[in-house]
Amino acid sequence: MDDDPVQGEDAAMAEVIPLPEGASSGSGRSPATRIILDTVAGSTDEPIVGPAGDAPPTDQVVAVPRLARHEIVLADDHRVGVAVCGQGLPVVLVHGFTAEGILYAQTLSRLVAMGFKVVAIDVAGHGATQGLPTGGDDLESYTRLLARVLDELGIRRAVFAGHSMGGRLVAQLAAADPDRAIAVVLIDAVVGECWDRLIRLSRFAPPVMIGLAALLVADTLSTLPLLRNPSQAAKLGRLVGPVLVGHARRPWRMFGPAISMMRSEPSRRILEDLGEAGIPVVVIHGDRDMPVPYATAVDAARRSAGTLVTVKGGTHSWVLKDPETLPAIIAELLDGPLARVRAAALGAAGLRADAPPTQVERAFLGPHAWVRRLTPPLELRTGAARHHRSRYEWTVSEPA
């Protein structure tokens, strides 16, 4: 592999831990799994929980989620970066092309307060995850790695959320193994007829893909709200900075995922399989997304029989620009379509709708799930709420 191992001070603070004898991860596989606990990456001077809210300071004690970063080593010695926080219904997030899971820390920390256990996984060749041995010649290779990570973490069922390329991966994962998915949330995902046409065109005209990549870079650079909210820009910059440095040091890591997207099969069958399997799908998309046009989402929702959420004025990376909008959308859906999904999942597990997070989590994780070991405790701090209102507005369209 071309990725550097943990070095220097970080390496001195890493620990390799074997699974207990006789224990297995959720599916009974890989008893030899090893976990490197990266205590440096999992701790910062201040939790990144977003901009301070408008409420005045108080003496109220509030729980502050901290997304802990770890590097796990699978049974075949493949290193994978994961970030974990919270307790409750598992939500697995897969990031977009050139990103990594920790960039979504602010949004994920808000989901924790809603009763979710969030797990962000770095895709092969991104973040702390090694590239694939073959260079990742097709997207199925990335999906198979995700499935192995879930098995070895002990996550049996989850809500799968994916942004951009991550949306394609979680859709493909759920379509191939519907029993894993409680629901699928596609966020400006590269699935749908419009995107498929762009991919077909790029095979004959490579500059098309170069243009799409340029649009993605421009959208990412516009993510930092320097003038609108300098404090938020500084916090987000703490997350984005190391990612950009990593790309500058090893730019070749992006070649594999880019080529894999160009070689990917049309997403039509994947979306239709989700609908035929009865997997609840929510398609959330910005109506000003230039790299992945909004028409892509309309087609994806139609083919998967999913709920379409239109983020007004949202560009491709709106979910990074405003950490409040996605949790607000999920909160609204939990009073609507997702309420039925959650109740059905809990009922199938023999739980009541008001079951405590510990029971909910236990129902969807394996008995020796290592993801529990990776989960940090909530911090209790004195102060006011630290959230603004969501920057974007949206509309929700139920399937016909």
Where does each model-flagged region fall?
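Alpha/beta-hydrolase fold catalytic core
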Residues: M1-V91, A113-F116, I155-R156, S264, ...
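Acidic catalytic loop of the alpha/beta-hydrolase fold
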Residues: R288-V292, H316-S317
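Catalytic histidine-centered segment of alpha/beta-hydrolase-like enzymes
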Residues: G314-P327
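Conserved alpha/beta-hydrolase catalytic His-Asp/Glu region
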Residues: D196-R197, L215-E276
